[in-house]
A protein has these predicted regions:
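Active-site/binding-pocket entry motifs
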Residues: 37, 83, 162-163, 182
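Extracellular low-complexity, Gly/Ser/Thr-rich intrinsically disordered linkers
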Residues: 179, 183-184, 191
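Cleft-lining beta-strand/loop regions that shape enzyme active-site pockets
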Residues: 1-153, 187-192
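A residue-level detector for conformationally permissive "hinge/kink" positions
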Residues: 79, 125, 144, 159-160, ...
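Metal-dependent DNA phosphodiester-chemistry modules and their immediately adjacent helices/loops
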Residues: 18-19, 114, 151-181
Length: 192
């Protein structure tokens, strides 16, 4: 193993999942999103759908490194039941079957940006639940391509910026503020 970072991250995620499971009596799902690119979508699918039997969801996007716009994740979180199917020899089930229909909450912090800014912005826009934590860092711009330089390097500069339905630039240099501000100060609490 070249680095233990991945193992430590996985241990942190699993500790959080077990804590949410224990404190909620098995009623809440815990889903951590490391980014809004491939690994983030993999994490979402792995954790969200495996916990479909839960009554609510804690989405943790702290330290989200961004990637792409997270509309897929928000759309999945926002799925509403459209009816039931009755089984001849079993209990009825919701349609669509994949999803957690109960309350949702998202944990955010100042180390989430770009797609990690877009995700809580969309979550709040759709009124999926409260945002808890600290304001995201406010870096919602994007790049398209990396023009090469003569020495074989590359240059990146923002080529996309986000604005809202009022026609105003939004989120960039502002971030997304929580509904409930909670500072994570484990050292101050003697829990480092």
């Amino acid at each position: 193993i070249a680095s233990e970072n991945g193992l430590r991250t996985r241990a942190w995620v699993e500790d959080n999942r077990r804590t949410v499971d224990k404190l909620s009596g098995g009623r809440l799902a815990y889903v951590w999103l490391p980014n809004t690119a491939g690994p983030g979508y993999t994490s979402f699918v792995r954790y969200f759908y495996a916990q479909q039997n839960r009554e609510g969801t804690v989405v943790d996007e702290r330290y989200n490194q961004g990637g792409m716009v997270a509309d897929f994740i928000v759309n999945e979180l926002d799925r509403k039941p459209m009816g039931f199917f009755a089984q001849r020899d079993g209990s009825p089930f919701f349609s669509p079957i994949a999803g957690i229909n109960g309350p949702k909450v998202m944990i955010i912090n100042e180390s989430a940006g770009s797609g990690g800014d877009a995700l809580p912005f969309y979550f709040k826009l759709r009124k999926l639940g409260p945002l808890i934590g600290t304001r995201t860092w406010g870096g919602l711009v994007g790049t398209l391509g990396t023009p090469p330089t003569i020495d074989g390097g590359g240059i990146t500069a923002p080529s996309l910026a986000f604005y809202n339905f009022d026609g105003k630039w939004d989120v960039e240099n502002i971030g997304v503020s929580p509904d409930i501000n909670v500072e994570n100060t484990p050292i101050a609490n003697g829990k480092d």
